[in-house]
Amino acid sequence: KEMRQDVEQLQQDVRQLREEVRRLQEEIHGFRHNSFPQCGADTVAPYVPHHFIHRLGIEARPQYVFPTNPFLQGENERWKPIQSSFAAHLKYSFKFRPNTCADRIYGGAYQGFGLAVTTFGDRKQLGDPVTFYVFQGARIARFNPRLSLNYEWNFGLSAGWKPYDNDYNSYNGAVGSRVNAYLNAGIYLNWSLSRYFDFIIGGDFTHFSNGNTKFPNAGVNT
């Protein structure tokens, strides 16, 4: 009788060991094929050779210029306030494939670099600066599979400014150097129109400054 109980216990241990081996095999298979139960995948997904997608974006940003110094308020060569600007952006970014485990863990995070041209409608006194920057963004909230609220920050350098000059540009108390730092942060709605196209709309804040490395440096904020 004791011998039979020992055999039954041994058989039960073997069954448990087989179950553990099966679970381990499923986990290894899921890791190789990017399918994880804890991320909501019910079945094993097909193997995907590329874990990232690459994106190209074009943005148009009409901007309001905050009148933070006399030059922008109208004390300039034209005696007119500088109240608006416009920036065109070309951007490249990459991110994890949508609806994968990594995409859900990191909230749709993406990163990349961009190139922008900004005009203030006064090339003689301010110039039309060109900006190169890096950026990063992610999802804040998802309202449905196609619509989400996202954030993004940009950081880079802008060149092509017309700085203060005692003889030729003496009114410009906003910009003291030809190259300035570029800082930007914003939030926007992202609407996925199709597999290949997204439409975004939102607002942001931009600051141009040289960090007081050269004066005057009142800066420009939009």
Regions found by a protein language model. Name each.
Residues F52, I82-A88, L126-F132, S177-L183, ...:
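Residues that define the transmembrane beta-barrel architecture of outer-membrane proteins
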Residues A60-F66, F94, L115-G121, F155-P163, ...:
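Transmembrane beta-strands of outer-membrane beta-barrel pores
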Residues K1-F36:
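Amphipathic, non-transmembrane alpha-helical stretches in extra-cytosolic proteins
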Residues H54-I58, A109-F113, F132, L147-F155, ...:
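Transmembrane beta-strands of outer-membrane beta-barrel proteins
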Residues I58-A60, A88-F94, V134-I140, W153-L157, ...:
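Residues on the lipid-exposed face of transmembrane beta-strands in outer-membrane beta-barrel proteins
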Residues G74-W79, F120-R123, N169-V175, G211-A218:
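Extracellular loop and loop/strand-boundary signature of outer-membrane beta-barrel proteins
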Residues V65-A87, Q125-L126:
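Surface-exposed strand-loop-strand hairpins of Gram-negative outer-membrane beta-barrel proteins
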Residues F66, N99-C101, R195-F199:
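Repeated loop/turn-to-beta-strand initiation elements of outer-membrane beta-barrel proteins
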